[in-house]
Amino acid sequence: MTRKRFLCPSVCRSRAARTGESKRRRLHSHDRRRCAITPDFDEDGRMAHIANPRPNPLECAEASQKVIMAPSRSDTTGAHRCLEDAAPVGELLVPRSSADLHESQRGQPSGATDSQASTLETESAPPSADSSSSAKLQRDDEFLAKYRVIGTLPAGSFGKILVCALRASVGEAEASRVPRSERRVAKRVRATSRLAIYLENEILALQYMNHENILKVEEVLRSEAYTYMITRKYDYDLYSFMYDGDLQWKDRPLLWQTRAIMKQLLCAVEYMHDKLLMHRDIKLENVFLNGDGTIVLGDLGTAMTFEKPRVARDYGWVGTVTTNSPEMLAGDGYCEITDLWSCGLIMLDMLSKDLLPLNGNTKKPGKQLRRIIRSLSVCDEEFPDPPCKLFDYIDSAEYTHTPMSVPPLIRRMGLPADFEYPLVKMLTFDWHRRPGASELLALPLFSSTITEERLFVWGLKSGAAHFSSWKPACRIESDTAALSLTMSDDDE
């Protein structure tokens, strides 16, 4: 029989104190490890990478009073500001303090209308000291006076998503009767929130660019409480088109649809890189599309400037773990070529018969990186040359796979050569060997003379449910030769 050991109360209290202190130390250590790979914020709302602190040039007085974009690579006429006057390379495009930015813009004319504002049924009133000032704040909100909220969408990474329409266009019609062409999406964040930094960054990046495959900002409205970015509403994003809520296949794009989507996506990425901007968070959820086959790239809250192409720098970890490139997951320096890895994952998800083949469903970069190495059978000779942190994961390398060959995961998909080659190139493990967007667009799959008008029938009924309703204007001879297209009889 085991004898129980009794301790006096003072000993129990001392032991409990030591146990609590040990737990606090472990939690503190865990927080330090977490902050080493994720962005954190200080009391002023500035984002700081704990693992690699460095001075922020945007804290100078001149930079905090003006918002400047980086020049285009092709600009040699001096039409744009030089890099010395632009936002410092490797920093967000806006001043870090959203409160300072809002204060500098408060004196600008807002152009508010005098029409009666209504309350927001789906949202609570902004917090305030007393209810009368809160009600006045809502009545004075220009967005609520100009737009009518008819619904909400799942919240994004950096704000609340509202579905709205102009009051002057739809009046008080039922939400279900509002035409799709009149619907807009408003991304809303609190003006004093740390998330306002990312929204202001996205607004600047989108307003700086003008491309048919990049989301366009229709209007920006600011009140004392919120900042709104209004854009066109698209039918769905690529993720909601492909998968349902239970992560089951809903529609898998056909080969010719995949080609059209990827060509437009690469055109958008090429344009961004020509403007010396990298996205850093390209994924299925950030590619928006309509039933007519047009796609746009959005959600540029993490976009960042760079000075020279293919020059890796330590910009810090950002984005989504499951779609980050190997160099970013390892904590190495990276460049704009990291966006091409994300494009390759999108193409892999569209062509694969498996659900998200490289999605490890993890938030740990190291675990996701080892999953990539195993899934793509990365050989030790395919690792970048040291010194680099990525070389520390060479113990997970595949030693039986032929270096620089097609990974078995992709080979088993049985794709046509025109599809397999660009997919393998985009998913090249070593970013030094990974091609840029311009090189990929020069490949036969995307450089074909087939026009987009020949791939789609325009003028589809508004609100087409899925891409399966698209009708190619030319027929494909076989699935293994997706690019050998012939004219339909009614087109001759």
Curated annotation (Swiss-Prot):
Gene Ontology CC: host cell cytoplasm; host cell nucleus
Keyword ATP-binding: yes
GO BP: symbiont-mediated perturbation of host apoptosis; symbiont-mediated perturbation of host chromatin organization
Location(s), subcellular: Host cytoplasm; Host nucleus
Chief location category: host cell
Region feature (Disordered): 99-137
Record protein name field: Protein kinase US3 homolog
UniProt organism field: Psittacid herpesvirus 1 (isolate Amazon parrot/-/97-0001/1997)
UniProt gene name: US3
